[in-house]
Amino acid sequence: MGISMWQLLIVLLIIVLLFGTKKLKNIGGDLGGAVKGFKKAMSDGESEEDKEPKKLSQNESRTIEGSVERNDAKTESKHS
């Protein structure tokens, strides 16, 4: 129960009659320009440094400083 070709043509004809071909051409051009601008902004935001993960050299190591506390105290239970 989809839309047939005739229904699509009728809807397209009504849109052309309402807006006119010149206005539809302008809307299409504006929409295309917006998509191009969005794609360009997305590609400009990604630099080569962001694309590749930072690799540590073989001689480079990381030291994490801190202290560890261990609490082994057992609670005393009262027996009645």
Swiss-Prot record:
Compositionally biased spans, kind Basic and acidic residues: 67-80
- Taxonomy-wise, where does this protein's organism fall, top ranks first? Bacteria, Pseudomonadati, Pseudomonadota, Gammaproteobacteria, Oceanospirillales
Stretches that traverse the bilayer: 1-21
Q: Kindly list the places in or outside the cell where this protein is found, as annotated in its UniProt entry.
A: Cell inner membrane
Question: What biological processes does GO assign it?
Answer: protein transport by the Tat complex
NCBIfam families reported for this sequence: PRK02958.1, tatAE
On the tree of life, the source organism's domain of life is: Bacteria
Name recorded for this polypeptide:
Sec-independent protein translocase protein TatA
Q: Spell out the molecular function terms from Gene Ontology.
A: protein transmembrane transporter activity
Q: What Pfam families does the record tag this protein with?
A: TatA_B_E
Topologically, how does it sit relative to the membrane? Single-pass membrane protein
Family membership, please give it: Belongs to the TatA/E family.
